[in-house]
């Protein structure tokens, strides 16, 4: 194979990767899609909202949200999966995210893959989170390399735990999150699990 042929092959392979990354998932009311730069201000506003971040250690600054956005993009590129932006069909509004994320901190269920979600406060209470998470879960069932998923949240976060239950996950146990200080009220987490393969 000469250099020109090699170059064509690389370009072709690169195009395939881009197409895979830009696939999106539709539900009756939502689109789970690749991120756009215009999502970033809405993403930052969501991550700065104390209602949304009630069960996290801190709200995020604009700079921290942008760094988070970059990590999401990197995970799609390196793993082939990640956190999709969630868009409402009726008005194309950015609502938050739902998708998959590698578990890399020191726990007995790592390495593993987490299914997670975060929606802006104005979209709570309408069933959007379980609708998006169910669509992501069903898409994952078609991926032979992913056979199980985990989800977890701090014990007081009953809203998120209810989403885990609604999408068919099973409660496994409680655990101390190693990245939360030992004396912090959010250290105790609950872990859910589901088989996908």
Model-derived segments and spans:
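Acyl-donor (CoA/ACP) binding surface of acyl/acetyltransferases
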Residues: 9, 17-41, 45-54, 87-197
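Conserved GNAT-fold acetyl-CoA-binding loop/helix
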Residues: 51-72, 82-84
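Short loop/turn motifs at secondary-structure junctions and domain boundaries
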Residues: 75-79
